[in-house]
Amino acid sequence: MIKTAQSVGELTRAIKNELESLFPFVRVKGELSNVKQHSSGHVYLTLKDSEAQIPAVIWKSVRARSPLELRDGLEVIAEGRLEVWPPAGRYQLICTALFETGEGEQRLALERLIAKLAKAGWFDAERKKPIPRIPRRIGMITSPTGAVIRDMSDVFARRFPAAELLLYPVQVQGERAVESIVRALRYFNDPPKPEHKPDVLIVARGGGSSEDLQAFNDEAVAEAIYRSAIPVISAVGHETDLSVADMVADLRAGTPSIAAERAVPDREELLRLIDNLVNRQSILMEGLISGAQLQVDSITSSYAFNRPVQMLGQFEERLALMEKEMKRAIAEKVRDREQQLTAAADRLAMLDINRTLKRGFALVTQDDRYVTSAKSLEADAKIGLTFHDGQREARVTE
């Protein structure tokens, strides 16, 4: 008995459906060859290694997003999906992203780290600590110079000058950045003095390239944030940047300025809240007085108490005294809170490092580290001096 045969088209369609469903996404490493830029804007090429080769296509829209200069011999990591092209009876790779080998491997390492931490539950919302509504002290982990510290200080001064600011200066990029950031997080969690322990921490840096932000994708920094007993707000780069530190932190802010806004309440809003509370107390007090007055009127109009007028006088005196005392207590609370806010604003102004530098002080650095003791400097050592209006270099003499 002769079985019914499939047509070439039927078999090819079956292969196409099976293959494309099995490989909706692939990531493959290889060498480019036969790179051809078509007039349509599409790029046709072959991805190969010592054992095999795969034809590949990069559509015009994908090519426009890639900064790579495609050339024969370039080692790349390609991402995409497999597709069967029936007219030629072959399969090809439809590329959705292309990375040079070094960049691609770094991306893969980052993806593996994110997958590892996600599996460990480090990103889970259930483990994230709430940010205190009214923090007394705020620890800032960032560079001591530049726009970040100025922007955050301006926000704190405007919104909530009562907060005490604690700065741990760190390197935010470079070889020592990871060690510096981890050391700062550990310091604030176990400071030598109780008054150095903040209620909330902000880890921040300005925008930059992916290489500049690399320290905030390091597992050691992620672990230090995860282990922190103090709530951590992460503000790394711009709103479009997302680092591992952002994902582990208890709260992610798009920019350092936004982090400062999320860390503290608005002073004007607090004052409005106080005014509302005062008004509510006043209304409550007036209601109590009105109720008491009605009782007094009822009593004085009754036959039994119509004669002892002196009792009515006593009630009125007590009511007047109660009203006076309640108004005085409310006024004192409002006055005390205003004095606290004013004092806090003065303390915040005193913490401004530029103000200190203008009084004749300078920051001393050696090899990008802050010098805190004369004993640590040897003769003829090269040092950096940061003044309020610029920087100079100097050498140490005996």
Swiss-Prot record:
It is found in: Cytoplasm. CDD domains: ExoVII_LU_OBF. Keywords: Cytoplasm, Exonuclease, Hydrolase, Nuclease. One of its GO terms (cellular component) is cytoplasm. Pfam families: Exonuc_VII_L (PF02601), tRNA_anti_2 (PF13742). InterPro entries: Exonuc_VII_L (IPR003753), Exonuc_VII_lsu_C (IPR020579), OB-fold_nuc-bd_dom (IPR025824). Signal peptide: none annotated. One of its GO terms (molecular function) is exodeoxyribonuclease VII activity. It is an enzyme of class 3 (hydrolase). Its EC number is 3.1.11.6. One of its GO terms (biological process) is DNA catabolic process. It catalyses: Exonucleolytic cleavage in either 5'- to 3'- or 3'- to 5'-direction to yield nucleoside 5'-phosphates. Belongs to the XseA family. Bidirectionally degrades single-stranded DNA into large acid-insoluble oligonucleotides, which are then degraded further into small acid-soluble oligonucleotides. Heterooligomer composed of large and small subunits. This is Exodeoxyribonuclease 7 large subunit. It comes from Chlorobaculum tepidum (strain ATCC 49652 / DSM 12025 / NBRC 103806 / TLS) (Chlorobium tepidum). The gene is xseA.
